A protein has these predicted regions:
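Conserved CoA-thioester-binding segment of acyl-CoA-metabolizing enzymes
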Residues: 1-57, 264
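Well-ordered beta-strand positions
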Residues: 120, 159, 163-165, 171, ...
Length: 264
């Protein structure tokens, strides 16, 4: 029996499960409820024998996902989330069906994570990719960070994470962050072609291939999660993240200079 979702849309057509983050006014930024619903939707698609491919996207034509909702983060939502296992990312990675990210606009911060944890990324030519963490005092650590290096390489991953620059869809394609880039008007047709091609292949072989790739991810997850737990401490949330959230809401640059104290 289909679940009732609030923040997302879930539909299956012609053996394709389509999961849509449905918060377009917030540029499809997520809250804790959104993350829980996405996790449940991926689990639903994974156990549905009629589903052969999963497509993840955002509502509208402006954003795939702009990361965490800043109001939710300011109220402590991100603090609660980051200290828990990354259930959604693990669920996406371990889904036994091929997962396509249909990137229809901004893919920033946590939205960028979601895209690069999918098996394939098909982007509209106006899409923008990037990370926000150090710019807004919103930390990520462990597997979410180091998995990007497996996708685009160490140097580029460090550039993306540490400098918080923005990258065009063409740059994402050149870097290997996207598999294909097409005009927005052709995005659905292109995603449809990839789905048809995958659905014509042996589902058992695809499951075995996915399990093989997941074995590497589990190794990254084990090492990275230990690092995350040691480095992202509750003390961080007292000031730096709060300053980042306040600055965003007040439309000013955050002032992190006072947090640069010598550590021994």
């Amino acid at each position: 029996m289909p679940r009732d979702y609030t923040d997302i849309l879930y539909e299956t057509t012609d053996h394709v499960a389509r999961i849509t983050i449905n918060r377009p006014k917030q540029y499809n930024a997520f809250t804790g409820d959104t993350l829980k619903e996405l996790t449940l939707a991926f689990e639903e698609a994974n156990v549905d024998d009629e589903v052969g491919v999963v497509v993840l996207t955002g509502a509208g034509d402006k954003a795939f996902c702009a990361g965490g909702d800043v109001n939710w983060e300011k109220e402590g939502g991100l603090e609660r989330q980051v200290l828990e296992p990354y259930l959604l990312h693990v669920t996406v990675s371990r889904c036994s069906k091929p997962v396509i990210a249909r990137v229809n606009g901004y893919s920033i911060g946590g939205g960028n994570h979601l895209a690069y944890f999918c098996d394939f990324t098909i982007a509209a030519d106006h899409a923008v990719f990037g990370q926000n963490g150090p710019r807004v005092g919103s930390p990520a650590g462990g597997p979410i960070v180091n998995y990007l290096a497996h996708v685009i390489g160490q140097k580029r991953a460090r550039e993306m994470w540490m400098l918080c620059r923005r990258y065009t869809a063409k740059q994402a394609l050149d870097w290997g962050l996207a598999n294909a880039v097409v005009p927005m008007a052709e995005l659905d047709a292109e995603v449809g072609r990839w789905c048809e091609e995958l659905l014509a292949l042996s589902p058992t072989c695809l499951r075995i291939l996915k399990a093989s790739f997941v074995a590497e991810f589990d190794h990254v997850l084990g090492q990275g999660d230990a690092v995350r737990r040691l480095t992202i401490t509750p003390e961080f949330w007292k000031e730096e993240q709060q300053e980042g959230a306040r600055a965003f809401l007040e439309k000013r640059k955050p002032d992190f200079s006072r947090f640069r104290k010598r550590r021994v």
